[in-house]
Amino acid sequence: MYRTMMKSKIHRAVVTEANLNYVGSITIDEAILNQVDILPNEKVQIVNNNNGARLETYVIAGERNSGTICLNGAAARLVQPGDTVIIIAYALLSQEELQSFHPKVAIMDESNRVKQMIEQEPPMTVL
């Protein structure tokens, strides 16, 4: 049996741009993607902390070290620049893979720089 598990998480990133006229997707700073092991074109879920909206799209790598978090296309209707979001990627893992698996979680600062990397979230934690 395979289980769908959180593989990667970018926690509390700040939206820098919402571009309605782009074809679609989310553009994320390439340096952030590398740290949490998310690839271009990988499917992600985005949770908007400001309004509760949840959506799925795919990733485009943005300029390295730019801090870019840009929602494109229809997704731009669900966010505003300055909103805080959580970006999550999932993986299908076998029981065997689960034994040694650790997700990568990046805790972001207000400038979209990785403040801290953790392998799992402590229970009942406010970050």
Curated annotation (Swiss-Prot):
Compartments reported by the entry: Cytoplasm
Swiss-Prot/TrEMBL catalytic activity: L-aspartate + H(+) = beta-alanine + CO2
UniProtKB keywords: Autocatalytic cleavage, Cytoplasm, Decarboxylase, Lyase, Pantothenate biosynthesis, Pyruvate, Schiff base, Zymogen
Binding site for substrate: T57, G73, A74, A75
Main location: cytoplasm
GO MF terms, alphabetically ordered: aspartate 1-decarboxylase activity
Cellular component aspect of the GO annotation: cytosol
CDD domains linked to this entry: Asp_decarbox
Pathway membership, UniProt: Cofactor biosynthesis; (R)-pantothenate biosynthesis; beta-alanine from L-aspartate: step 1/1
Gene3D superfamilies per UniProt: 2.40.40.20
HAMAP family per UniProt: PanD
Official protein name in the record: Aspartate 1-decarboxylase
The encoding gene: panD
